[in-house]
Amino acid sequence: MSSAADFDPKPRRASIAVDVGGVIVGGGAPIVVQSMTNTDTADIDSTVAQVAALHRAGSELVRITVDRDESAAAVPKIRERLLRLGMDVPLIGDFHYIGHKLLADHPDCAAALAKYRINPGNVGFKDKKDKQFAEIIEMAIRYDKPVRIGVNWGSLDQDLLTALMDQNAAAGSPLSARQVTREAIVQSALLSAALAEEIGLPRNRIILSAKVSQVQDLIAVNSMLAERSNHALHLGLTEAGMGSKGIVASAAAMGFVLQHGIGDTIRVSLTPEPNGDRTREVQVAQEILQVMGFRQFVPVVAACPGCGRTTSTVFQELAQNIQNDIRKNMPVWREKYPGVEALNVAVMGCIVNGPGESKHADIGISLPGTGETPAAPVFIDGKKALTLRGPNIAADFEALVVDYIEKRFGQRTAAE
């Protein structure tokens, strides 16, 4: 019979630590959140603004497209502008097709980037493939930069895939085309990493990723990579999609892999709504890591879903207000109140689970449900502290939350 301990997360897979502009990826370091801009990198103002927004939202690494001379020329200026804003956020250059040429022609760009991302499926073709791949690796060695070898199934090395398909067709028990494609993705990453090491790039300068669009494929290829190498791994779907579908797909895929100890950095590739907020993908990535217990970024607000006992919307509005206040104040609170991200707040709507859930939180309130006495007990550190009554229960509880934060986490600052 299984014990409760059997269902805890598996120990983190041992991977080699890679320093990306001062942010450690792998080697047991906290799982890193990263994101990518969707601006024209040559538009310096727009790119600086979006990188800054992503970084403020919590993105620890930000990737930018470097697709032509104008983009490459803009990179050192973007880096300089960000530093003037007090943002020493590592920038990752996303290269396809002509990365070797852009890095050679723009040495200031090569120096300003914290990492190069290359795709072995389009770094070059036929006779030029290994040569152009080697040129990028040599630039990484020259400037002492790490490289992410990022394989995408949408741009998979067709020569490798064809060879594996031919071998499979001749096998006694052939695999499905989907299974062969998974194998090709994994082999592309591993063969490219081996070639990079042969050229002279140290293993602690290599991160691998294998990106696909389907949840089961992401689970499979990353599990295979984890078994066959100790390189740091970057997790993410190639394109998760829009809205709730993208969030659910990302959480399902990465949640399973992370639970098995696999993954050193994640990116949630949400398709934003037209004129939508790009920082949403950062928030979702943080929430995946936080709800699974791997990292803490912001205080947790637990609230019941509501039922026939909670016809009032007061508890919903209160939970939303507290969540909004937390998001708004976190940039200041993070500096002013170290450890505040570990706070747990409960806002419950009736007597059934309200008191119990509130006791489990650092501070919680059990609001009256339909037909219940119009009083709301407040629990602090597991004990009933007081009961709120009257028309200002919500405002009074919000004030109590702020007071609790100041007293509990402000004392740490004073002690330090």
Swiss-Prot record:
Its cofactor is [4Fe-4S] cluster. It holds the Pfam family GcpE. InterPro entries: Dihydropteroate_synth-like_sf (IPR011005), IspG_bac (IPR016425), IspG_bac-typ (IPR004588), NO2/SO3_Rdtase_4Fe4S_sf (IPR045854). GO terms for molecular function: 4 iron, 4 sulfur cluster binding; 4-hydroxy-3-methylbut-2-en-1-yl diphosphate synthase activity (ferredoxin); 4-hydroxy-3-methylbut-2-enyl-diphosphate synthase activity (flavodoxin); iron ion binding. It comes from Rhizobium etli (strain CIAT 652). Pathway: Isoprenoid biosynthesis; isopentenyl diphosphate biosynthesis via DXP pathway; isopentenyl diphosphate from 1-deoxy-D-xylulose 5-phosphate: step 5/6. This is 4-hydroxy-3-methylbut-2-en-1-yl diphosphate synthase (flavodoxin). GO terms for biological process: isopentenyl diphosphate biosynthetic process, methylerythritol 4-phosphate pathway; terpenoid biosynthetic process. Converts 2C-methyl-D-erythritol 2,4-cyclodiphosphate (ME-2,4cPP) into 1-hydroxy-2-methyl-2-(E)-butenyl 4-diphosphate. Its EC number is 1.17.7.3. Keywords: 4Fe-4S, Iron, Iron-sulfur, Isoprene biosynthesis, Metal-binding, Oxidoreductase.
